[in-house]
Every structure is written in structure tokens, then in C-alpha cells.
């Protein structure tokens, strides 16, 4: 599994995420309260920004290439592919 550091407005949380778990799901199981809405990768409620490390969010359908290249990630459909650090609650910074 990978160690994902979530930088939330209420502080930093470290969550262990297995390769087959979405980051949002693993965070919830660990008791970390992250925003979400559709849980299907088709809105921006759960958006975060990857500061370091890598993720696979091929299931998402909302972000464009520029947003993904900038590091934005939809945590509800993102798998960690390495240890990574993600800033959460980034929806308002997408636009």
C-alpha cells in the first residue's frame, strides 16, 4: 500500500491507501472527512491537487488535460500509484 498525505484545511492527515482503493474511500475509512458529491469522477466537489507523487485517475471524466497537468485530481476516482501528497478542498481553485 501507499502512504498518502492529505493536506486538509484542518491539518495534515496521513492515510494508508491500497493500490485498488480510491483515495477518497480510503480517507473515509480512516476517518478523514473530505468533500465529495457524485463519487463518479464527473464533478469537481472532491478535487485535490497533487503536490508530490503519482496517481491514476483514468476513471475520471471531468478534468481537462490542462487541469490534470497542473496536478488536479478527483479523489473519488483516483488510485495512488506511489506515496503522494495531496492538497484537498481544491474545487474553487480549478477555475
From Swiss-Prot:
GO terms for molecular function: 2 iron, 2 sulfur cluster binding; electron transfer activity; metal ion binding. GO terms for cellular component: chloroplast. It is found in: Plastid, Chloroplast. Keywords: 2Fe-2S, Chloroplast, Electron transport, Iron, Iron-sulfur, Metal-binding, Plastid, Transport. Binds 1 [2Fe-2S] cluster. Signal peptide: none annotated. SUPFAM superfamilies: 2Fe-2S ferredoxin-like (SSF54292). Transmembrane segments: none annotated. Residues 2-92 form the 2Fe-2S ferredoxin-type domain. PANTHER family: FERREDOXIN (PTHR43112), FERREDOXIN-2, CHLOROPLASTIC (PTHR43112:SF3). This is Ferredoxin-1.
Amino acid at each position: 500500500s501507499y502512504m498518502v498525505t492529505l493536506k486538509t484545511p484542518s491539518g495534515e492527515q496521513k492515510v494508508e491507501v491500497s493500490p485498488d482503493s480510491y483515495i477518497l474511500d480510503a480517507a473515509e475509512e480512516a476517518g478523514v472527512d473530505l468533500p465529495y458529491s457524485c463519487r463518479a469522477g464527473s464533478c469537481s466537489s472532491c478535487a485535490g491537487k497533487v503536490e508530490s507523487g503519482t496517481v491514476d485517475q483514468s476513471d475520471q471524466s471531468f478534468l481537462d488535460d490542462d487541469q490534470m497537468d497542473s496536478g488536479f485530481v478527483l479523489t473519488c476516482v483516483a488510485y495512488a500509484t506511489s506515496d503522494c501528497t495531496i492538497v484537498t478542498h481544491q474545487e474553487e481553485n480549478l477555475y
